[in-house]
């Protein structure tokens, strides 16, 4: 199936393809790590299958702070190698997917000359480690310059700020780009396909029993593979338990939440890195007509797809914004949308969540099952390369060299032409470029409305539920007026026409998304749960 089009109508054919042959590699997990591994392995010439229990990027990989950053704060934790890798990987992503690496000035207030000296020393190291070009190195702003650059900031008592460029992304679209690229290179990929058991031959992992989790599908297949990689993110330990019941957990889960406001309510021009009351750094990030704030970092007991958000989480972020920004007091009713995600960190007993390293780690079980946990969105490509290097070694395979640092991701080609063609559309054009890159021109040519996006989500991007489009293909759940609720009915109609949904199924899909939105807003004060959508 060497095509970029992930057609949600062709699932029956994909199910058949999964059991027709023995693959070199089966990847369990369709987040950024699994998607990166599948793409790398397929580009090297291995036969690859990937299954995801829900939708691609439905876990951690759609709930991040949506940044490709070098991890400056990890220098203070001594993670030099992590910073070097993440800083270098930023430049690679900028090259292979420029539409998914939007450069943005980050401003960090400095309270004293001593803190300025310390910060600059860290930035010099960061820039050297990451090969940052001269034109993109940091600059120091005095108080007057700081106030002029970001008028909403409270600059009293500060010694100015440091400005340096980092990159923003759309995390779910980055996953999807890797999935589509993997399929174009020959991988067989499928969402809503859960690994329920592992297969063994002579004590070695030899595949998985996979069952559909999609309403109306009853498919169950045995996928045979010479090697299995567990890249299930927060569900990594659950997959490891399929190999050996009672296996010692490797992960420590941490929850992070984000709040979204109308840009008119929080009209900043730069990404701001602010100190919260507990000395943690939080981000305030402009994105189109919206501004989002995050994140928290607290241990969380379970690997939920939709983690519970608490009133304490919300209040913590609101207090940080109020402390630093000269804006009328933000209240729950100002919140347009909010999301929470769970980070799959490597367990380090005795440490607070924000102290746990973001390094990745690879384990190989006695049966040969390879598991990878931890890591950062910024370094996904390098993480994948390490895993595939190990796979090639274990299989003693003849494989091509890693090509993921050079091969462009879908949407990279034709980007400047599309940007020029869509420039007259203003913010809407920028939104489409951020989602589709060079492919945005065809979206506009087809009409560019919700129905066009929703149809494309089905025919080219593997969407088979309304949630897939609303949350992960379009980001309307986070970055749209009224949390994108007004898009649900027309999107359901467009998807339903392709997927054979009757009126009741369309209504059920809309109700499901509406319930998810209410679940997220349940953390707000009762009088604000139906507000904030203006």
Predicted features by range, described:
Residues 21-23, 216-227:
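Core beta-strand elements of the Rossmann-like FAD/NAD(P) dinucleotide-binding domain
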Residues 182, 239-257:
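Glycine-rich beta-alpha-beta "Rossmann" dinucleotide-binding loop(s) and their flanking helix/strand
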Residues 1-25, 40-44:
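Extreme N-terminal leader/targeting segments of oxidoreductases
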Residues 13-17, 54, 100, 112-122, ...:
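C-terminal accessory subdomains/tails of enzymes that are appended
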Residues 191-206:
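A conserved short coil-to-beta-strand element within the FAD-binding core of flavoproteins
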Residues 19-33, 49:
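Beta1/beta-strand and adjacent pyrophosphate-binding region of the FAD-binding site
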Residues 42-63:
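Glycine-rich FAD pyrophosphate-binding loop
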Residues 66-149, 282, 417, 427:
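Dinucleotide-binding Rossmann-like beta1-alpha1 core, especially the glycine-rich loop
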């Amino acid at each position: 199936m060497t095509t970029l089009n992930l057609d949600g109508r062709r699932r029956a054919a994909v199910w058949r393809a999964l059991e027709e042959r023995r693959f070199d590699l089966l990847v369990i997990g369709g987040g950024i790590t699994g998607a990166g591994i599948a793409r790398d392995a397929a580009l090297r010439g291995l036969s690859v299958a990937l299954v995801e229990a829900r939708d691609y990027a439905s876990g951690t990989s759609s709930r991040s702070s949506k940044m490709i950053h070098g991890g400056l704060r990890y220098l203070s934790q001594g993670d030099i190698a992590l910073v070097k890798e993440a800083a270098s990987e930023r430049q690679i992503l900028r090259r292979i997917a420029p539409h998914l690496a939007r450069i943005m000035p980050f401003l960090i207030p400095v309270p004293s000359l001593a803190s300025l000296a310390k910060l600059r020393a860290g930035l010099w190291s960061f820039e050297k480690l990451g090969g940052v070009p001269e034109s993109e190195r940091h600059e120091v702003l005095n108080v007057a310059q700081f106030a002029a650059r970001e008028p909403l900031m409270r600059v009293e008592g500060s010694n100015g700020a440091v400005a340096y460029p980092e990159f923003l992304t759309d995390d779910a679209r980055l996953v999807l780009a890797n999935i589509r690229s993997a399929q174009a290179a020959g991988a067989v990929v499928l969402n809503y396909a859960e690994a329920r058991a592992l297969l063994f031959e002579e004590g070695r992992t030899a595949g998985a029993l996979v069952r559909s989790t999609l309403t109306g599908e009853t498919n169950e297949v045995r996928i045979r593979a010479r090697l299995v990689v567990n890249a299930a993110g927060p569900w990594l330990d659950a997959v490891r338990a399929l190999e050996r019941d009672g296996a010692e957990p490797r992960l420590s889960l941490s929850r992070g939440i984000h709040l979204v406001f109308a840009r008119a309510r929080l009209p900043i021009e730069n990404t701001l890195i602010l100190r919260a009351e507990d000395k943690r750094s939080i981000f305030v990030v402009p994105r189109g007509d919206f501004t989002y704030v995050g994140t928290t970092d607290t241990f969380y007991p379970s690997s939920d797809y939709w983690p519970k958000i608490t009133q304490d989480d919300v209040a913590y972020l609101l207090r940080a914004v109020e402390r630093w920004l000269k804006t009328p007091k933000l209240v729950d009713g100002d919140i347009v949308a909010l999301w929470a995600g769970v980070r799959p960190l490597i367990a380090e007993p005795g440490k607070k969540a924000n102290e746990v390293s973001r390094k990745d780690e690879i384990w190989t079980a006695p049966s040969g099952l390879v598991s990878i946990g931890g890591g950062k969105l910024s370094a996904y490509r390098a993480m994948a390369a390490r895993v595939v290097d190990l796979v090639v070694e274990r299989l003693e395979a003849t494989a091509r060299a890693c090509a993921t640092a050079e091969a462009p991701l879908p949407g990279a080609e034709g980007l400047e032409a599309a940007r020029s063609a869509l420039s007259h559309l203003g913010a809407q054009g920028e939104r489409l470029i951020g989602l589709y890159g060079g492919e945005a021109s065809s979206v506009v040519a087809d009409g560019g409305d919700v129905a066009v996006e929703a149809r494309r989500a089905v025919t080219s991007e593997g969407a088979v539920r309304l949630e897939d489009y609303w949350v992960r293909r379009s980001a309307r759940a986070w970055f749209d007026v009224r949390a994108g609720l007004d898009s649900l009915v027309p999107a359901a109609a467009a998807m339903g026409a392709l997927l054979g949904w009757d009126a009741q199924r369309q209504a059920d899909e809309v109700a499901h998304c509406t319930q998810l939105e209410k679940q997220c807003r349940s953390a707000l004060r009762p009088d604000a749960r139906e507000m904030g959508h203006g």
